[in-house]
């Protein structure tokens, strides 16, 4: 919802009953919005949790006199940041194992790469369902991811998504998609592959970066 000109996103953490909020998005100081979040979370009988704070957001929270927050970082939730050229070229010893995976994949399979469109949605969701069967636990998180994927495909063009698919024969074995954050940063939202095809994750990552 929009509160005092700021976009406020409320969600369930990890598919559990715990409620979290993203840092309010908008121009200027978001701290006046905190009282609305406090009222909302109090009605749910929980404590206020704000996830994915920016350094600037943290400083603003620290400056709010009436609020007391504990700050924590979870490395499991952090994103990886790569140079696009590294993903395209896989240079040096650092990426030797990835190059080995790709070489084995290319030697074993005849494949093709296709840019993703909304028309790939059904195949991608089927592959995601097969991938999910191999994962035990975290069912709430995986179900939330599945719902997010469905919504992304429903609004693929409006969200300006870009993606790619890899086929071996007529079988979809890997796909990925994401969107631009700004003119020099791209966020890969989803990357899935059939683990029966060794190197599928590595090659979809490389070809999409190209």
Where do the protein language model's features map onto the residues?
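Short, glycine/charge-rich beta-strand/loop segments that flank catalytic centers
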Residues: 46-64, 76-79
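Conserved GNAT-fold acetyl-CoA-binding loop/helix
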Residues: 136-150
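Structured helix-beta-strand junction loops
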Residues: 44, 108-109, 159
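Acyltransferase donor/substrate-recognition loop-hinge adjacent to the catalytic core
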Residues: 67-138
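Short, contiguous, pocket-lining structural segments
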Residues: 93, 97, 116-120, 141-144, ...
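A structural signal for short, well-ordered beta-strand segments and their strand-loop junctions
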Residues: 47-53, 81, 113-117, 165
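Accessory, usually C-terminal, subdomains that scaffold auxiliary metal cofactors
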Residues: 147-210
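Conserved donor-binding loop and adjoining core beta-sheet/short helix segment
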Residues: 1-56, 167-195
């Amino acid at each position: 919802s929009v509160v005092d000109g700021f976009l406020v996103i409320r969600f369930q953490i990890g598919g559990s009953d715990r409620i979290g909020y993203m840092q309010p998005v908008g121009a200027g100081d978001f701290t006046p919005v905190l009282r609305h979040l406090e009222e909302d979370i109090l009605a749910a009988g929980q404590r206020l949790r704000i996830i994915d704070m920016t350094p600037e957001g943290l400083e603003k929270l620290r400056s709010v006199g009436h609020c007391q927050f504990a700050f924590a970082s979870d490395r499991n939730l952090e994103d990886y940041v790569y140079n696009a050229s590294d993903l395209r070229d896989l240079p040096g010893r650092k990426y030797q194992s990835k190059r080995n995976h790709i070489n084995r994949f290319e030697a074993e399979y005849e494949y093709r790469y296709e840019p993703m469109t909304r028309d790939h949605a059904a195949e991608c969701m089927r592959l995601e369902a097969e991938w999910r069967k191999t994962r035990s636990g975290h069912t709430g998180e995986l179900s939330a991811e599945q719902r997010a994927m469905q919504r992304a495909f429903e609004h693929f063009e409006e969200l300006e998504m870009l993606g790619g698919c890899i086929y071996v024969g007529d079988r979809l074995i890997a796909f990925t998609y994401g969107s631009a954050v700004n003119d020099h940063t791209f966020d890969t939202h989803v990357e899935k592959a059939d683990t029966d095809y060794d190197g599928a994750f590595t090659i979809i990552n490389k070809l999409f970066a190209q």
